[in-house]
Amino acid sequence: ALKGNPQSVLSCIEGFVQDGHRRWLKIAGGPKAHVIDAATSTRPLSAHEIGIEMGCFVGYTAIRLGWRLGGQGLWGASMRAGVLSTELEAVHICIARHHIDGAQLSCAAEVWPGHIPWTTPRYIEQFGSYGAGFIFMDHKGTRFHDDLGDCSALRLLAPWSRLLCDNVLKPGAPKHLWMHHRAPLCHRSAVVLSLHEFLEPGVEDWQSLRDEAPPQVPQGAAGPGSGAAGRRARALPPAHGPEHSA
């Protein structure tokens, strides 16, 4: 791979998978990579947001996300990451960091060691509430709904943040699909995409995509229309709906 060239590093990882004796390396390439690129291009990070990946493996998608989103978000083009990936396995962490270094994207993507339920509160501690503009889940489908619930409870999700989940058919994320992608519970932006696995056209898998609507203010609660904050809000130009949509 050409050092400092993200596409070259990604192609090198894909070439490793193309070897018939090494199919064990499962990455979100091919049509899944196209979905990731489209999802990030239509929902860029704003100035105060970060991107999060849950489940890094060998760093393939972390490179793609850092390449697409790392120049945006909380620190712009500074030397601090705009995309943070969490991985539990120590060997995978070393490999992923090596690949990210090879793409020279260490300033855009960072790999954190740890168990995701224990790491999620750290995002709030370091970046504050409503700071996650994009989340990619690719760790354990039976935990997607729990980890999304943790993010919501901790107020991590920015208004209209985008959630993209991989492998929701195989191995599967049935409870996540039942809770967030069935009427009448699903938001109008929620879709499930049927794709084939990278280099395996006969193997179907799904990716789920949804945008998180802003939290609703309880009826009767003091909202932005009350007090000095409300007077300041009324002095601002009217909003024109969400900045991003699916």
Where are the predicted features?
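Short, hinge-like loop/turn segments at secondary-structure boundaries
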Residues: 43, 101-104, 127-130, 181-183
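A general structural signal for well-ordered alpha-helical segments in protein cores
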Residues: 6, 10, 33-36, 62, ...
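Rossmann-like AdoMet
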Residues: 1-28, 42
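Active-site segment flanking the S-adenosylmethionine/decSAM binding pocket
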Residues: 56, 108-173
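SAM cofactor-binding core of SAM-dependent methyltransferases
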Residues: 23-121
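Short, well-ordered secondary-structure micro-motifs
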Residues: 64, 95-98, 121-124, 147-148, ...
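C-terminal substrate-binding/active-site "lid" region of AdoMet-derived donor-dependent transferases
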Residues: 143-246
